[in-house]
Structure formats: structure tokens, C-alpha cells
């Protein structure tokens, strides 16, 4: 029997699917629901960029697994796993967006209130591109989704939680209109909808379009 066997686990994906690789975490939980059957005590949640609104979910969990795009300073597409005290430290070391600052605050607040999960695991991927509004995950990052899920499954099994191939029904995931397949098919092209900024305000955009 494992030394640590949590009764309630939160598997959380955070980020913004509208900003290219920043959607990595959300796409991981979406994919995990499609490929693995999780027991009732494991909750899959698309946390998006909700910040402190995620606090009640952390309060309920004894263990936490977080998927996110994190700037570790490594080669783009590199997958990294951090645990426990290293999780808030790495999420705040080099902030890429407001959602990371917000999630740091969530962890700090949960710790102050005495409700922080006793085990935390961050499965992060070094992004390639974050400035493409409406863009897709880059191949180097998208290619790490299944490996990130496999790492989460290993972590869950190490905690004594049974995970099998299958599917998990959850009401806590991305809206179907923003699911990856629908998003990719329904998104307008770059010619139809500029994704690099209005040239009236962003000189770099004008140079690219010239």
C-alpha cells in the first residue's frame, strides 16, 4: 500500500487557449478526459485563467496535479515535472502571463488558510509561442500532451489511485465550442482575422504585414 493515498485529487489544467501554447494545460485535461477513466475521487478541471476563483477547488483536494505552460528557460517543447514546494516557486520565477501570478496567489492563500493540498505536482511544458492570439498549440508543445498525461497517470498510480484506459465524463472542462477540434476547424484564417495586432498600435505588426 502506498504511504500516501489521497481521498480527493484535483487534476487541473490552467492557461488560455486563445493564446497559442498558453492553452497547453487546458488541452491536457481535455485530452485526459478523452483517453482515461478516472475514479470518482479524482476531479478533472479546466481552470482557465480563473485565479482566486480556483481556491474552493484546492480546499477540497488532498492532492493536486497541475498542467501548465511554464517558462523554465529550457528548449521549447521540454516537459518538466516539479513537486510540492517547487511548484509555486517555479510558477512565479518567470511569469509569462497574469494567470500564473493568479495561481501563485491561490496556492499562497490556501497555505495561509491551512487548506492547501498536502501533495502538489506541476507538469509543465516550455512554450514555443505565446503571442499568436487565436493561434494553435505549436507542434513541439502539442506533441507533449500525451507524455504529460502519462506522467500524471504515473503520479496518480503512485498514490494508489486506479487509472485505466477509457473516458471520463466531466462538466468542469472547456466549453464544447472551444474544444480543440472545434476550435481548430472553426477558427478564421490569418488573412480573415489578423492575429499579430493592429498595425495602428503595434509597429511590429505593420512590419510583419509589409
UniProtKB/Swiss-Prot annotation:
GO biological process: protein processing
Keywords from the named record: Aspartyl protease, Hydrolase, Metal-binding, Nickel, Protease
Keyword Ribonucleoprotein: no
Family: Belongs to the peptidase A31 family.
Disulfide partners: none
Name of the featured protein: Hydrogenase expression/formation protein HupD
Reported function: Not known. Could be involved in the processing of hydrogenase.
Lineage, top ranks: Bacteria, Pseudomonadati, Pseudomonadota, Alphaproteobacteria, Rhodobacterales
GO function term, MF aspect, one: enzyme activator activity
Species this chain originates from: Rhodobacter capsulatus (Rhodopseudomonas capsulata)
Binding site for Ni(2+): 22, 68, 99
NCBIfam families from the UniProt entry: hupD (TIGR00140), hydrog_prot (TIGR00072)
Keyword Metal-binding annotated: yes
Alphabetical list of InterPro entries matching this protein: Pept_A31_hyd_express, Pept_HybD-like_dom_sf, Peptidase_A31
Domain of life: Bacteria
